[in-house]
């Protein structure tokens, strides 16, 4: 059998991934992904997560953010996580596997949230990348719009929102939408985010009902 050759871009990604200090650090610490260092840095600056809070984590797999969040909110807090991909269980995290773009999955997610509002909505979602920037940007903006819709449905007054967004077409319009809904909005580029990546994190606090 002929071994499949990687494209130049995927070969570069693989080399970056295995040489990445944050990947190595995550493996050494037994963490689920390098993404935990991003939310850790955001938490250090913005103090979004506190004991007893209820958190919704969108695009949760493999579970780095959920793992971090449940450690922050503690036994009296709740983390409700959702992803289209499977995720190994985490003590204290209520995980729903499914595509929350589908009405049945969204309904199940809202049912798990229950009648009480949540304190934080966080989203590290990204689409499956096609390699065509225009297509990928449109897909990613669609996902972040859905995450903002989730805020409108479940976030309590003065709640917080942290979302990964790729800079490009639609970014400025989306940022303005968030500014209308929250009292304070910041853009973060964590040190653990690859410099070449267009990703940034919008951190919004003080949700206006």
Curated annotation (Swiss-Prot):
Chain sites annotated for binding S-adenosyl-L-methionine: 63, 65, 83, 99, 124
Principal place of residence: cytoplasm
Gene Ontology terms: cellular component: cytoplasm
Active site: 164
A GO term, aspect molecular function: rRNA (uridine-2'-O-)-methyltransferase activity
UniProt KW keywords: Cytoplasm, Methyltransferase, rRNA processing, S-adenosyl-L-methionine, Transferase
Catalyses which reaction(s): uridine(2552) in 23S rRNA + S-adenosyl-L-methionine = 2'-O-methyluridine(2552) in 23S rRNA + S-adenosyl-L-homocysteine + H(+)
Location relative to the cell: Cytoplasm
Protein family (similarity comment): Belongs to the class I-like SAM-binding methyltransferase superfamily. RNA methyltransferase RlmE family.
UniProt xrefs under HAMAP family: RNA_methyltr_E
NCBIfam families: PRK11188.1, rrmJ
Protein name: Ribosomal RNA large subunit methyltransferase E
Species for this entry: Aeromonas hydrophila subsp. hydrophila (strain ATCC 7966 / DSM 30187 / BCRC 13018 / CCUG 14551 / JCM 1027 / KCTC 2358 / NCIMB 9240 / NCTC 8049)
